[in-house]
Amino acid sequence: MTAILERRESESLWGRFCNWITSTENRLYIGWFGVLMIPTLLTATSVFIIAFIAAPPVDIDGIREPVSGSLLYGNNIISGAIIPTSAAIGLHFYPIWEAASVDEWLYNGGPYELIVLHFLLGVACYMGREWELSFRLGMRPWIAVAYSAPVAAATAVFLIYPIGQGSFSDGMPLGISGTFNFMIVFQAEHNILMHPFHMLGVAGVFGGSLFSAMHGSLVTSSLIRETTENESANEGYRFGQEEETYNIVAAHGYFGRLIFQYASFNNSRSLHFFLAAWPVVGIWFTALGISTMAFNLNGFNFNQSVVDSQGRVINTWADIINRANLGMEVMHERNAHNFPLDLAAMEAPSVNG
């Protein structure tokens, strides 16, 4: 009998740990995905903060011209960034122990790769943790599905794009002005504004903002009055109440008359699915667009597509954008190459007499 009790005790230690990890009674749900999420996100966050404050300049282009990104090296919150790993490293896995010294690792931008890889693993686990908690509570899995959109976008700019371009130095810098620089260079090299998937992403983000504002304002305008004129309307709601807090019939009637009848949802469930799906699908397409442009399947090129009867070019806005792209391409990485890639790739004129 004693032996049986001891075996149960030894089994229960692991069992208690499993129950604690997967318990929905904890103040914050951990879950098995959380076991990996917590250390990876803590690592990414810690290294980001330290590097943003104190990292030395990084030779991002691999031409012995380091770029400063940290606060202690002259930057402010706007101009500061974690500089991407050097082009000299390319796509090589570059942990600290692969460098000859910590100084070399910092000079070649090792912190960027460390932060990005831990961050992507962490947010993927966060998405898995959302699904896991939904599963434990008997909920549907759509919260994790919605979160997959920003996860896909982050993976596209931090991992897929560098893979397609052949170097982590082409990844998005971790900072405000660095993000803007990434966007400008991306437009110059890939003409993203003329890519249909980017257009769908813009429609998703702006449309989602519009629909969110419309829904919130309609609900707020059709609340069922539960308070006096001297009280806040918000005091009329009690958490967990069974009664509707707004009149969906009134909201439906208002919006149907404002635009037309079938523009208004008469089903609350389909309405909220639409509100979730619109921006999520748009951001999915944007991430897919970044991932295709990573391998140089670029936006539409309508340059010099309109000519008159004499064959002379009539400039369109596409030509104006192309001129701006060339200018931006000339100005970035000025010392890394002498000509924009589009011009450098042109066939050389014949010099034969």
From Swiss-Prot:
E.C. code: 1.10.3.9
Swiss-Prot/TrEMBL site (Stabilizes free radical intermediate) positions: H190
UniProt-annotated site: Cleavage, residues: A344, A345
Topology with respect to the bilayer: Multi-pass membrane protein
Annotated positions binding pheophytin a: Y126
Binding site residues for Fe cation: H215, H272
Family affiliation: Belongs to the reaction center PufL/M/PsbA/D family.
Protein name listed in UniProt: Photosystem II protein D1
Organism for this UniProt entry: Phaseolus vulgaris (Kidney bean)
